[in-house]
UniProtKB/Swiss-Prot annotation:
Gene that this polypeptide is encoded by: hsd17b3
Residue positions of the active site: Y200 (proton acceptor)
Described purpose of this protein according to its UniProt entry: Catalyzes the conversion of 17-oxosteroids to 17beta-hydroxysteroids in the presence of NADPH. Favors the reduction of androstenedione to testosterone. Testosterone is the key androgen driving male development and function. Cannot use androsterone and androstanedione as substrates.
Name under which the protein is recorded: 17-beta-hydroxysteroid dehydrogenase type 3
GO biological process terms held by the UniProt record: androgen biosynthetic process; testosterone biosynthetic process
Subcellular location, principal: endoplasmic reticulum
Binding of NADP(+), residues: 47-76
Pathway linked to the protein: Hormone biosynthesis; testosterone biosynthesis; Steroid metabolism
One Gene Ontology molecular-function label: testosterone 17-beta-dehydrogenase (NADP+) activity
Transmembrane annotation, as ranges: 6-26
Alphabetized UniProt keyword annotations: Endoplasmic reticulum, Lipid biosynthesis, Lipid metabolism, Membrane, NADP, Oxidoreductase, Steroid biosynthesis, Transmembrane, Transmembrane helix
EC number(s) reported in the record: 1.1.1.64
Amino acid sequence: MTLTEIIFVLTGTCAILVFGGKIASLIMMLITKLFCPLPEAFFTSLGKWAVITGGSDGIGRAYAEELSKQGMSVIIISRNQEKLDRAAKKIELNTGGKVKVIAADFTKDDIYGHITENIEGLDIGVLVNNVGILPSQIPCKLLETSDLEERIYDIVNCNVKSMVKMCRIVLPGMQQRRRGVILNVSSGIAKIPCPIYTLYAASKVFVERFSQGLQAEYISKGIIIQTVAPFGVSTAMTGHQKPDMVTFTAEEFVRSSLKYLKTGDQTYGSITHTLLGRIVQSIPTWVLQSETFQHHFQEYVKNRDRR
């Protein structure tokens, strides 16, 4: 066999393995959804409490409400006390569960002592690191970002540091009890080069790599650590997009994503978003990085937010 033939065979084999792996992951999701549902008491078996950052609205509140429906007491942490109180009342009314609130601004450095004091000693079975912010509502190039120095500081603190610090606070108890789940909310755009969302996308890549490494370190301790990477979810961050075949309500997405808790250290949270992720990842990088794509994507977000 000539060198050229060997190269062609190896290239074809690699392509088949990659494609086969993607098909296998979809089959695993279908099998899990249809034939391997989580036991009814799964979440309460992990511990009494669930802690959710960014839990006053959107995906965070949906996680809090769903975990409360599953029988857990929940702690929601967010910046605005008034929004926290409203969310807590709504969750308690809808589920009859116990809700505790902690007001904390995750763009700040000095909040973690306060958080630790309020959750220390609790039997925490689930941690959802959901809190996150965009550097600007309309995507733009890095140097066009308003108050760039402040935005850099806020993004690193809120999207990156908060996840690491919350894991640092909660993980020791989970390790001691040899049970627990940590869900770190990322984004589908972390899977591709994403100019004009550079800061945000890069922060979510950190979420994915940190979570993968942490899962490898602690899976033997009975702890599940998973990245959840949605695409379209109708929240304030996405301008309350109208739900459709691709865009989920926060409640729909959370219910779906929890079904795939045992499918590995990463999930898009739904079969629809998994297929979308495969399509997006197949787009050539030069297309995603082109000025034309950046312009049209920026215009799409502007028009979406005007609706």
